[in-house]
Amino acid sequence: MDQDIKTVIQYPVGATEFDIPFDYLSRKFVRVSLVADDNRRLLSNITEYRYVSKTRVKLLVETTGFDRVEIRRFTSASERVVDFSDGSVLRAADLNVSQLQSAHIAEEARDSALMAMPQDDAGNLDARNRRIVRLAPGIDGTDAINKNQLDTTLGEAGGILSDMKDLEGEIHDYIEKFADDTSVVRGVAWVYNLGSANGGENVITINKPTRTYAVPYIEVNGSRQEVGYHYQFDLNTQSISLVKPLEKGDFLMAMTTESSVPLESMLASAAGASSVGKLGGGTVQDFITNTESKFGSFSVLEDFGPVGTPEDTAATLLSSLSSGKPIVLTRMYSLPMRTFSIPSGTTLIGLGAKTGFKAAGGTELFVNLLEVGGTDVLLSNFAITMDAAGRGSVGSVACYGVHFLASSRGNRAQGLKITGKAVGSTVGFTHGVRCNGVRNVVDKCDIQYCSMGITLRGEYHKITNNYLNNHYVDENLGPWTAASMFWDGITGEGCINCEISGNISEYNGQSGIYFGGNNSLSQGLIITNNICRYNYNRGCDTGISGTASDTNNVIDVTYSSNILENNRETNLWLFGVSESTLIGNHIRETALYDTLFPNQASTTRAGLALGGLTCNNNEIVGNNIRVRSTTPFGIVLNGTGHYLAANRRIGGASNYIFASDNQRLVGNSIERYTGSFTPTLVGTAGINVTSATGRYEIQRNVLTVEINMTLSANGATGAIAIGYIPGLSSVTPVMRDIKVTLLNGWLPALGDKTILAREGTSNDLLNLVVFSYGNQSNEVAQYVGPASSLRITATFNTSATL
């Protein structure tokens, strides 16, 4: 039997283009995925990969976290490629396609069977060294068991703790509860039967060395149960009577109020770990020792020295960083405004926004408060406050909160709250995070009052789920100038294959997101699912400075599914950018715009704009553009080679694409653009135009025109030429499907003669001719009466190559 898998292939990551080795009937039957042993991501055509040819695809996304690219054919069994109807003509090609679809479905079914869990030669099921997932718990003695059952059997109780920070925090909580009352201990957790019920129990007894006075509530498998409704507590017997019996394996935790015993004795007792809500029993020290052996020990900063003055804290921080241990920050520490270098492998974790560092003083510029030049550094869950007190400028930065240097690789700033202004002070020129190097991550950071929130340069960075606001707009700081301390939320130059997604950037002094050349090359950027609103300049601003070249350019950028709202100037702006895709973005102006920017000139406003002569070959598809009535354009179009399709536009001026008709028709490929014009008579004497209207539609390089005119004359002679047809002045059109309809009012002398339209003396003119019995004449004016109406419809193909 043929055992080859023919409809699925996996390639190792590392390349960007991959062959499709099988035939298929439709691209929608081909699925491209990124695959790892424990993860799978199905990619979307156009936005995450595209077809280079019928047999080859190109990835548009980063493959970090995955080791294989899978291409699979999955032919629909319900969506027929060919649908036969009674009475129709059967063609061999249709029958072949229908038979091929059935063959593809059968071939894919065979491959699925081969890829499932087969039997070996002895009849045993063979997992072929792969994990078996979603395995139900075993019941009978011969059943397979899953890892959770094994962990419970071995006493690991389902994963006790992720790190020492949780343990320390919970112990502190219980210490505070002990300190509240010297006679009674409140809020002590007790876990029944080491965290796993036997099953069937409806009465359980609290067997603790201290007397329990009350049980305010219990939790069963994380579901809170209320006293008097779900259970009763008997003080005399120290028992809990449940309305619903426990099931086997249930986790029951009771929150108790009990008599006090010395804290040291309780924590050192055999039930000490259980007393603070941990499974498995044993003393707290036993639990700490066991956890350290699994996860490594954490230390608090104070373990390494005094933290009273900024200089004390500086020395202690340096000492802790040289220890090689993960450091926990338990409060806000004052530091001098100077650079602190973080070694590779350091983990620096806070306990939230009320822990971290506040730096002030000094006169130095270009301070890197937390400087990372190596690898595998984690900065997580703490605050940084920089008090630069008005120092610095855009070219002389006072301080960077976190600076990943060009030598850095694979570091992470996560959950940081970074503020560029101390209470009562003024803003100096600061960057929240400066991200250079390769494959660094800035995630879920809250960055406010920094001149620039996040700035980046390098390769494969991920800037995700951050909040950026320097409060220039919402605090009404006046007209912006280049000397301002308030710039963009996210700024990138010289960025390759970076992802900027899920960020909110608002109220900034310049743009929400800016990427530019500035003598550098940026390409392969994925900018998606961001919200950029209320910014003083633009929502998303991408462009080059100076002359475009191989080393000074912005190319191959994908803007998708972003929300760009009420930004002062153009919401989505590309200047000199080429080979890029703008798809599915939501651009809107609301009544709030007039409140935020009441005096803004309409000439600087548009929903989406492409500018510059080097702005070429971009795709603008499926964008939703809603602008105010005072905004003149939904789309501004400069450059050539662009493809525009399925963009929805509401509001603004009627001429929603600002461009010449020649640009719309010839220089670019535009789907279903409609417009109007006023036709005139050219070089014709003795005839008056009573009324004239013209409508046209551009569908790529095809122009469809309808002209309606009413003419009046008395004894006129000569030819009639009508112009000017939009977009045709500089091209040689091929006219087809032309029709002249004489509506009424033509003189009887016309008789059975026919009036036709022919190409005029220039590309954008039509000449009317009289045709009769094979003879053609230009003498048409003699048949025009006091009110002669006609309609002309025509279709033109341009000869230009798009």
UniProtKB/Swiss-Prot annotation:
GO cellular component: virus tail
Keywords tagged on the record: Degradation of host capsule during virus entry, Degradation of host cell envelope components during virus entry, Host-virus interaction, Viral attachment to host adhesion receptor, Viral attachment to host cell, Viral tail protein, Virion, Virus entry into host cell
SMART domains reported in the protein's UniProt record: PbH1
Family annotation (InterPro entries): PbH1 (IPR006626), Pectin_lyas_fold (IPR012334), Pectin_lyase_fold/virulence (IPR011050), Phage_T7_tail_fibre-like_N (IPR005604)
Principal subcellular localization: virion
Keyword Electron transport in annotation: no
Stored Gene3D superfamilies: Single-stranded right-handed beta-helix, Pectin lyase-like (2.160.20.10)
Record carries keyword ATP-binding: no
Subcellular location: Virion
GO biological process: adhesion receptor-mediated virion attachment to host cell; symbiont entry into host cell via disruption of host cell envelope; symbiont entry into host cell via disruption of host cell glycocalyx
Biological function: Functions as a receptor binding protein (RBP) and probably mediates the attachment to the host capsular exopolysaccharides. Displays a depolymerase activity that specifically degrades the KL47-type polysaccharides of Klebsiella pneumoniae capsule, which allows the phage to reach the host cell membrane and bind the entry receptor.
Domain notes: The N-terminus anchors the RBP to the virion. The central part and C-terminus probably binds and degrades the host exopolysaccharides.
Family statement drawn from the similarity comment of this UniProt entry: In the N-terminal section; belongs to the Teseptimavirus fiber family.
Known partners and oligomeric status: Homotrimer.
The protein's name: Depolymerase, capsule KL47-specific
